[in-house]
Amino acid sequence: MSDEANDEMVDVEETLRQPIVAVTGHVDHGKTSLLDLLRSIGGNKTNVMNREAGGITQELGVTNVPSELLVKAIQTMPFKDKPKFESPGIIFLDTPGHESFGSIRNRSGSVADIAILIVDIVEGFKPQTIQSIQILEENNIPFIIVGNKIDRVHRWESKRGRSSWQSWNEQSQDVQKMADDFYYKLLGQVASHSKFNLAKYWEGIKTFDIKNDRLFVPMSAKEGEGLQDLLFVILAMAEKFAREDLIIHEQDMAEGYVLESREEIGVGKTIDIILTKGTIRVGD
């Protein structure tokens, strides 16, 4: 057999890029608090909210969470067999929280592989929630519903760093009933404003159909509860349903999205981009 034929039979190991995740939802439902929580798991605690006029994110902010932090977080999940993922990290895009910034939110939606739609589990859907779903559907972006502020459920007992799946099942029966009531309210709102069925991720992930279903992840960004659940669901969805888009082909022409363009003193015109395909080389 020729060397050429042998080469053709060798499996080429696939290398994945980071999934790009848009973070969107109604103002004050917890987008920035979630991103603060993500940044804090690396030991570098920040509070973006304090640096923003009126507490509203006015530009697209990028947060890169590397794989070592993802592994550390997901290892705390109460699974018998610990899941393994190939992604080198996750890139989160924070989108504006004011309705006048709809065009920028739309830009973020078109960049993303997956989105997380944050909803205050007690308040439910608001106008920007509905707008976000419409944008995500128009761009064919799969999304996860995050039921944030689960600690607002009466007598809910939070524990920082705990899986929200574990926490949900450790609450008293009365508290679980109240949490279920809020969940079923969200389920109805999702059905009213989209074509999708909603399921708690621990009940629906094995039978998940991306054409018809969306997963629900409860959490408390304020109390640091349920972050590992969200990271797990993001990676599980991305590597299963968006895998072809994540595979890096180094010889391909570079493709990506310009997030911002500006003039910098002493440097000149600069652009911030997210590279989604191929490789950028000197001289391109």
Locate each region found by the language model.
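Conserved catalytic-core segments of large NTP-driven translation/proteostasis enzymes
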Residues: 17-38, 61, 68-69, 199-284
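Flexible beta-alpha connector loops of hexameric P-loop NTPases
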Residues: 45-51, 90-91, 117-124, 166-180
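Active-site phosphate-binding and catalytic loops of NTP-dependent enzymes
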Residues: 3-11, 42-54, 67-80, 101-103, ...
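C-terminal effector/interaction modules appended to NTPase cores
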Residues: 2, 73, 86, 110, ...
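Inter-motif core of Ras-like GTPase G domains
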Residues: 102-123, 137-144
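Conserved nucleotide-binding/hydrolysis micro-motifs of P-loop NTPases
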Residues: 41, 70, 96-99, 121-125, ...
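GTPase G-domain guanine-specificity segment
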Residues: 150-209
